């Protein structure tokens, strides 16, 4: 789901083109790996607050944040394997501290992808690969 954030640099006139591209990538990638359920790419742009509200029913809510130095996926203490996970990955400039605090109010946990700051295009791939290696298809 594309989000409007304080540091987002995507031009609004490009959003439709990007969403169509992401949908095509999701479909082609699913076919390639034999995945039956194609990941959903939302049509419109949501605010962070709306995304957080819409994630209430998820078993686990994560924000991958470059400033989180101590907490990684392997450090999470879970009672059971999650069946559904809401994932937030920041824009090119990262999330602001105020945005991180807002996500925490909605029950999101901050986790690190490691010591390197990843490109906005790369971070989702790394995050999803790590989640899948821990818990399989979600």
How would you label these PLM feature ranges?
Residues 32, 88-92, 110-112:
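Short glycine/serine/threonine-biased micro-segments
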Residues 1-62:
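RNA substrate-binding interface of SAM-dependent RNA methyltransferases
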Residues 82-102:
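A C-terminal functional module that forms or caps the active site or interfaces directly
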Residues 97-138:
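Structured adenosyl-cofactor binding patch, chiefly the S-adenosyl-L-methionine
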Residues 67-81:
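Strongly charged, low-complexity linkers/loops
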Residues 39-40, 59-63, 83-87, 109:
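Structural motif
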Residues 44-45, 64-67, 91-92:
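Fold-independent oxyanion-binding glycine-rich loops
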Residues 68, 92-93, 115-118:
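Short, acidic/turn-prone active-site loops that include or flank metal/cofactor-
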């Amino acid at each position: 789901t594309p989000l409007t954030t304080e540091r987002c640099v995507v031009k609004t006139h490009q959003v439709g083109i990007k969403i169509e591209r992401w949908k095509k990538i999701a479909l082609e990638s699913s076919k390639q790996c034999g995945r039956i359920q194609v990941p959903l790419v939302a049509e419109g742009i949501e605010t962070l607050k709306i995304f957080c509200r819409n994630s209430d029913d998820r078993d686990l809510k994560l924000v991958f944040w470059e400033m989180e130095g101590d907490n990684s996926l392997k450090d999470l203490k879970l009672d059971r394997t999650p069946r559904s996970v809401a994932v937030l990955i920041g824009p090119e400039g990262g999330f602001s501290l105020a945005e991180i605090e807002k996500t925490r109010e909605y029950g999101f946990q901050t986790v690190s992808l490691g010591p390197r700051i990843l490109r906005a295009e790369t971070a989702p791939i790394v995050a999803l690969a790590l989640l899948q290696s821990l818990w399989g298809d979600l």
